[in-house]
Amino acid sequence: MLARTCSFCGKTIEPGTGIMYVRKDGAILYFCSNKCKKNMIGLNRVPRYVRWTNEYHELKKMRTRS
């Protein structure tokens, strides 16, 4: 089986766990938890600005290097 990554926080999702969400346009989003799904779908939050996501930490590293 193929391990997936969460579309919001960037964590790896083990096979048989997580949530697969399909948008009306056919885009498939994978979530590791209901917390990630609620933040992205329900609250329309962007992972860049949420402190506990991998994308936020990667951008923070880039900012502190410069």
From Swiss-Prot:
N-terminal signal peptide: none
Gene Ontology cellular component annotations, sorted alphabetically: ribonucleoprotein complex; ribosome
Residues bound to Zn(2+): C6, C9, C32, C36
SMART domains: TRASH
Entry keyword Transmembrane: no
Keywords: Metal-binding, Ribonucleoprotein, Ribosomal protein, RNA-binding, rRNA-binding, Zinc, Zinc-finger
Disulfide bond positions: none
Zinc finger (C4-type): 6-36
Any Gene Ontology biological process: translation
Cofactor note text: Binds 1 zinc ion per subunit.
Cofactor(s) the record lists: Zn(2+)
Function: Binds to the 23S rRNA.
Family of the protein in this entry: Belongs to the eukaryotic ribosomal protein eL24 family.
NCBIfam families linked to this entry: PRK14891.1-1
PANTHER family per the UniProt record, alphabetical: 60S RIBOSOMAL PROTEIN L24, RIBOSOMAL PROTEIN L24
Assembly and oligomerization: Part of the 50S ribosomal subunit. Forms a cluster with proteins L3 and L14.
Entry protein name: Large ribosomal subunit protein eL24
